[in-house]
From Swiss-Prot:
Domain of life of the native organism: Eukaryota
The protein's role, per its UniProt record: Potent microbicidal activity; active against S.aureus and E.coli.
Organism of this sequence: Ovis aries
Protein name: Cathelicidin-1
Keyword terms, alphabetized: Antibiotic, Antimicrobial, Disulfide bond, Pyrrolidone carboxylic acid, Secreted, Signal
Name of the gene: CATHL1A
Gene Ontology molecular function: lipopolysaccharide binding
């Protein structure tokens, strides 16, 4: 009789551990990674955009070293680039090629990592690319000054 109770108690304990083990992965699966949250924000940007083509994540700045609370807003900063895929496409942006000379946008704001109640507050601005033109060679400023002084002294 005593053995039967012990085995029944052990069975219940095992059942509780099994249920607890099954519940934990589903709770942690509710949290997005920093990158996943940004990709969701890019999807939302594409949904709200009136531009002909969709954008794809080009560059993601380092995640903040904040707390791990999925409900607290995390600062994000990233760049997106226009793709060749039209807005009407059913294809995920990651499968679209970047458009040659496509528009670049710099996006900043906050995201939450909670998968169910994820919030995005993102602002994107056109990102002007800086074109560096090669200037004709000229001697350093100090050399020009010395040359001017030398010419005036010699005349």
């Amino acid at each position: 009789m005593e053995t039967q109770r012990a085995s029944l108690s052990l069975g219940r304990c095992s059942l509780w551990l099994l249920l607890l083990g099954l519940a934990l992965p589903s709770a942690s699966a509710q949290v997005l990674s920093y990158r996943e949250a940004v990709l969701r924000a890019v999807d939302q940007l594409n949904e709200q955009s009136s531009e002909p083509n969709i954008y794809r994540l080009l560059e993601l700045d380092q995640p903040p070293q904040d707390d791990e609370d999925p409900d607290s807003p995390k600062r994000v900063s990233f760049r997106v680039k226009e793709t060749v895929c039209p807005r009407t496409t059913q294809q995920p942006p990651e499968q679209c090629d970047f458009k040659e000379n496509g528009l670049l946008k710099r996006c900043e704001g906050t995201v939450t990592l909670d998968q169910v109640r994820g919030n995005f507050d993102i602002t994107c601005n056109n990102h002007q690319s800086i074109r560096i033109t090669k200037q004709p060679w000229a001697p350093p400023q100090a050399a020009r000054i010395c040359r001017i002084i030398f010419l005036r002294v010699c005349r």
